[in-house]
Design a protein with these regions (language model features):
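A cross-kingdom feature that marks ATP-driven nucleic-acid transaction machinery
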Residues: 1-110
Length: 110
């Protein structure tokens, strides 16, 4: 239950940010018949920002699995990828950003 509530909180923050910026849509999720899933896809100007949400306080490399595979499943270019989670360690220098949920705004304003 904790994970679902955490994910819902992050989705709501993304939606609030987009609406406050004057965007009326462009927030999606991805799930296919093989149960591959990405929690948030932000589509803007023909490009995608993909976000995986994890309530865990500890980072695991498996958090990035679907973000790495996403380009095999969709045609729209994925320009940014991030894991937003409950832990303190952050990394914004790699192909997939790792952010504490309190710093979600850094991803949304980038």
């Amino acid at each position: 239950m904790h994970g679902a509530l955490f994910e819902n909180m992050i989705v709501m923050e993304v939606l609030k940010h987009r609406y406050n910026q004057g965007f009326s849509g462009g927030v999606y999720f991805y799930r296919d018949s093989n149960q591959n899933e990405v929690d948030i896809l932000l589509k803007e100007e023909g490009e995608i920002t993909a976000i995986e949400v994890k309530s865990s306080m500890t980072y695991h490399a498996s958090f990035e699995k679907t973000l790495r595979q996403l380009t095999n499943w969709i045609k729209t270019p994925v320009v940014k990828r991030a894991v937003v989670y409950g832990g303190d360690f952050e990394n914004t220098q790699s192909e997939i950003n790792l952010l504490n949920y309190n710093n979600l705004h850094k991803l949304l304003h980038a």
